[in-house]
Amino acid sequence: MDKLIIKGGSKISGSVNVHGSKNSALPIIVSSLLSEKTLKLSNVPNVVDVLNLIKLLKNYGVKIEHKKNKLKISPSKIKNLSADYDVVRKMRASILILGPLLSRFGEARISLPGGCAIGTRPIDIHLAGLSKLGANFDIQNGFVVGSVKSQLIGNKIKLPFPSVGATENILMASVLAKGETKISNAAREPEIEDLSKCLIKMGAKIEGHGTKTILVQGVTKLKKAEHEIISDRIVAG
């Protein structure tokens, strides 16, 4: 086809259903690890990455009820702090588990996504940001092993570039950190705003989400919440 001819002038009407955003659902599902209370989500997209993440959380001992586009996540009885390599290698978003686990339990162990070495993917920006909050990391046999001496402590963190994943990881970790955390050069995507809104419903104190500077005042615990995932802007076009 050499050309495409479009004849306008006709009135456009109707509607289309757009499923929930995968890039919003993944960090929000992970955020459930911060609390012992139930998190109910709706408009959850039925895509492979979400299904893999559900499998990963179940490996941790999280109870999850999945019906159509709804999730009921009950993370009160987490029994395992080491992520399964077979699941992690399938999805980069698994690195987001570090922040919540370190914040709530003070330790986490996760294989490098895809078995990659540091530097081949932007994992280092996650580790650098979490280190500013007081986390310590070692790389052992292809695993990232993180620990916290007592509790994560709020700090001023300036990202070298507005990484969406790093912003999400640091944001989640800082929710239970002691004191205030300031994230500068933060990502401003709608998915960051959606995650922040869900965390606020859970009891987090967050300001500035959707801007390049996010302020988080740490809290001691979170509460049960319900949240609807935003529609996928990529699918909507």
Give the label of every model feature segment.
Residues 1-237:
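Structural preference for solvent-exposed beta-strand-turn elements
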